[in-house]
């Protein structure tokens, strides 16, 4: 089973693809979708949508895991990230993929055993759990791998 994990954003959206076979979870790829600040928000959403569809077609995941919005101090940022999430949800639905959401607390708790871990702890554990040579960069890609890991270890899979 292939899982694509998403750390939503509109400037930088992280993704990570894992494969689960029995009890083994393997890293396939990770990266980010970036959008140019000079583009209108509509065009930025279009870039996210088209690039995400390309990833879905290239890696053919069986499921998608996405981090849910939890809390943002900046309302404008929360709205923009919510719009980017909406584009991901639409593309996932169009490809008829099951979608699973995890809160930041669930992701941290699942990866480190402590729901209030900081980013560096999560990144180090992602590196260790996936047997990677180095911590995935940028941070958004490491976060997306952590989200995918959460789904991979769920009992329903």
Swiss-Prot record:
Q: From which domain of life does this come?
A: Bacteria
The cofactor remark states: Binds 2 Mg(2+) ion per subunit.
Please write the reaction equations for the catalytic activity of this protein: Endonucleolytic cleavage at a junction such as a reciprocal single-stranded crossover between two homologous DNA duplexes (Holliday junction)
User: What does the record give as the active site?
Assistant: 7, 67, 140
Q: Name one GO cellular component term.
A: cytoplasm
Please tell me where Mg(2+) 2 binds in this chain: 67
| Names of the cofactor(s) | Mg(2+)
Q: Name one Pfam family in it.
A: RuvC
Q: Name one GO molecular function term.
A: crossover junction DNA endonuclease activity
Query: Residues that bind Mg(2+) 1, according to the entry?
Result: 7, 140
Cell compartment(s), UniProt: Cytoplasm
Keyword Hydrolase in record? yes
The UniProt record lists the EC number as 3.1.21.10
Chloroplast as a keyword of this entry, yes or no, is no
Task: Return one Gene Ontology term, BP aspect.
Answer: DNA recombination
Going by the UniProt record, its keywords in alphabetical order are: Cytoplasm, DNA damage, DNA recombination, DNA repair, DNA-binding, Endonuclease, Hydrolase, Magnesium, Metal-binding, Nuclease
- How does it associate, per the subunit comment? Homodimer which binds Holliday junction (HJ) DNA. The HJ becomes 2-fold symmetrical on binding to RuvC with unstacked arms; it has a different conformation from HJ DNA in complex with RuvA. In the full resolvosome a probable DNA-RuvA(4)-RuvB(12)-RuvC(2) complex forms which resolves the HJ.
Record's function text: The RuvA-RuvB-RuvC complex processes Holliday junction (HJ) DNA during genetic recombination and DNA repair. Endonuclease that resolves HJ intermediates. Cleaves cruciform DNA by making single-stranded nicks across the HJ at symmetrical positions within the homologous arms, yielding a 5'-phosphate and a 3'-hydroxyl group; requires a central core of homology in the junction. The consensus cleavage sequence is 5'-(A/T)TT(C/G)-3'. Cleavage occurs on the 3'-side of the TT dinucleotide at the point of strand exchange.
**Membership in a protein family:** Belongs to the RuvC family.
What is the protein name stated in its UniProt record?
Crossover junction endodeoxyribonuclease RuvC
Its taxonomic path starts at: Bacteria, Thermotogati, Thermotogota, Thermotogae, Thermotogales
Encoding gene, per UniProt annotation: ruvC
């Amino acid at each position: 089973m292939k899982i694509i994990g998403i750390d939503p954003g509109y400037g930088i959206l992280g993704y990570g693809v894992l494969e689960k076979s029995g009890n083994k979870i393997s890293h396939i790829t990770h990266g980010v979708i970036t959008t140019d600040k000079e583009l209108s928000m509509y065009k930025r959403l279009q870039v996210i949508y088209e690039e995400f569809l390309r990833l879905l077609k290239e890696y053919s995941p069986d499921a998608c895991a996405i981090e849910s919005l939890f809390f943002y101090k900046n309302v404008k940022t929360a709205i923009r990230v919510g719009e980017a999430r909406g584009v991901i949800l639409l593309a996932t639905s169009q490809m008829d993929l099951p979608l699973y959401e995890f809160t930041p607390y669930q992701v941290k708790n699942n990866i480190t055993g402590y729901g209030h871990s900081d980013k560096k702890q999560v990144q180090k554990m992602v590196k260790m759990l996936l047997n990677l040579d180095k911590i995935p960069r940028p941070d958004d890609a490491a976060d997306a791998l952590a989200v995918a890991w959460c789904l991979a270890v769920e009992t329903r899979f």
